[in-house]
């Protein structure tokens, strides 16, 4: 057995042992541990930020994009956000032990359905150190042990945060294997995690298409897929165009490097001539590059004279309709009808978050009913697809699959059920 196997199996054994304890631990016990983690993160803020500076400097040397560097960055505000996230999760109702239903059979047996933890959860993620804290909080509160494998870009930050969380858990009386961070950046460790069925009950990948596809295709451990977010906004012919502009600017520019950001804008032909020059000019103020279909390129180029705006437009390629930019780039297409918009989303969407801007009730209902996505919006930004925005506290990811969980995954999505049966001597 090689060293990586030994290293990983050791962590798997500890996690499995810890999960047995966590499955029945008192809710107050877990909440106290979460509060202590928050206190310890705050007390060690300078250490975390110092470790992050090393990762940021290395990231800049490697030429990471601005959006990736933004995801990697940890400052005082983001540490405080992590602390607040831990406290929020501590204050959420504990789902474990909840009896969902109970019924009595004619033979006198009482049967119930009870919520229980999944067991050991493996999280594989990229350059977002806050995931280390969010995943830990949700896994602990839902009674699961967690094995964390972050991206190499954030290794120093994750080590600093992981050590604090692991020590806090142990000092709170939790087993050693409750929270474990994989500290090696060797990519082979990921491939070995995908086969660790004996110890890991479910894997959750968070990252780009390459990471997610690798996990889904090669894992023998069950996977909850957090998919790529190629999100669309469709501006209907009846749309309030001021509302549409506000939503598009927010969805594209507030934080372009996240999975619920807007990537493709579809505009009905009836409003294209008036709306497209305005929206392209507006988003150019934020440095957004617009990749336009042939018709929209003609409309914009014929209406705009500002050299700066014109420098940020180009004609879209077929590849652009399938690209999650995670950057200040937006694909734009004119469509002839709602049907064409629905077909485009069907062909190119990733089942994450889709929005329609419309004042037409019938069109809004068709969009809600016919779009196959985890979150479908009428007259609101796709940026709301988020655990905290949905009232779940932190989230472990946004699932784009249909089995077990779909959409933002909070505490209840990290549980399963078992049947509990009470009898008084019945035999079959």
Curated annotation (Swiss-Prot):
Organism expressing this protein natively: Clostridium tetani (strain Massachusetts / E88)
Protein name per the record: Gamma-glutamyl phosphate reductase
EC code: 1.2.1.41
GO biological process, one term: L-proline biosynthetic process
NCBIfam families per the UniProt record, alphabetical: PRK00197.1 (NF001221), proA (TIGR00407)
HAMAP family: ProA (MF_00412)
Pfam families given in the database record: Aldedh
Function: Catalyzes the NADPH-dependent reduction of L-glutamate 5-phosphate into L-glutamate 5-semialdehyde and phosphate. The product spontaneously undergoes cyclization to form 1-pyrroline-5-carboxylate.
Subcellular location: Cytoplasm
EC class (word): oxidoreductase
Gene: proA
Catalyzed reaction equations: L-glutamate 5-semialdehyde + phosphate + NADP(+) = L-glutamyl 5-phosphate + NADPH + H(+)
């Amino acid at each position: 057995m090689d060293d990586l196997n030994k290293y990983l199996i050791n962590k798997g054994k500890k996690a499995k042992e810890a999960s047995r304890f966590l499955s029945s631990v008192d809710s107050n016990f877990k909440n106290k541990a979460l509060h202590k983690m928050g206190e310890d993160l705050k007390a060690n803020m300078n250490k975390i930020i110092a470790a992050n500076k090393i990762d940021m400097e290395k990231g800049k040397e490697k030429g990471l994009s601005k959006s990736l560097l933004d995801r990697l960055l940890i400052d005082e505000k983001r540490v405080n956000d992590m602390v607040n996230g831990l406290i929020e999760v501590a204050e959420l109702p504990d789902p474990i032990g909840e009896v969902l239903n109970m019924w009595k059979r004619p033979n006198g047996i009482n049967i119930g359905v009870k919520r229980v933890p999944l067991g050991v959860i493996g999280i594989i993620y990229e350059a977002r150190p806050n995931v280390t804290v969010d995943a830990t909080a949700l896994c602990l509160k839902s009674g699961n042990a967690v094995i964390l494998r972050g991206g190499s870009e954030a290794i120093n930050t994750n080590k600093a945060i992981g050590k604090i969380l692991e020590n806090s858990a142990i000092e709170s009386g939790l087993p050693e294997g409750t929270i474990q961070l994989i500290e090696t950046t060797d990519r082979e460790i990921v491939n070995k995690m995908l086969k660790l069925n004996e110890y890991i009950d479910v894997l959750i990948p968070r990252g780009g298409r390459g990471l997610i596809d690798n996990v889904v295709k090669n894992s023998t451990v069950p996977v909850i897929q957090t998919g790529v977010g190629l999100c669309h906004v469709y501006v209907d012919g009846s749309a309030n165009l001021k509302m549409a502009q506000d939503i598009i600017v927010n969805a594209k520019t507030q934080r372009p490097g996240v999975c619920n950001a807007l990537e493709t804008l579809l505009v009905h032909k009836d409003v294209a001539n008036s709306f497209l020059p305005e929206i392209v000019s507006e988003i150019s103020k934020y440095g957004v590059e617009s990749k336009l279909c042939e018709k929209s390129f003609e409309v914009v180029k014929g209406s705009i004279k500002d050299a700066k705006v014109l420098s940020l437009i180009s004609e879209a390629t077929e590849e652009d309709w399938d690209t999650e930019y995670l950057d200040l780039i937006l694909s734009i297409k004119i469509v002839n009808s709602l049907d064409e918009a629905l077909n485009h989303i069907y062909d190119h969407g990733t089942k994450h978050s889709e929005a329609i801007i419309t004042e037409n009730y019938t069109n809004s209902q068709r969009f809600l009913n016919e779009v196959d996505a985890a979150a479908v919006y009428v007259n609101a930004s796709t940026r709301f697809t988020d655990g905290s925005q949905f009232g779940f506290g932190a989230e472990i990811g946004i699932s784009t699959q249909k089995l077990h969980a779909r959409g933002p995954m909070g505490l209840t999505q990290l549980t399963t059920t078992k049947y509990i049966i009470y009898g008084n001597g019945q035999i079959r």
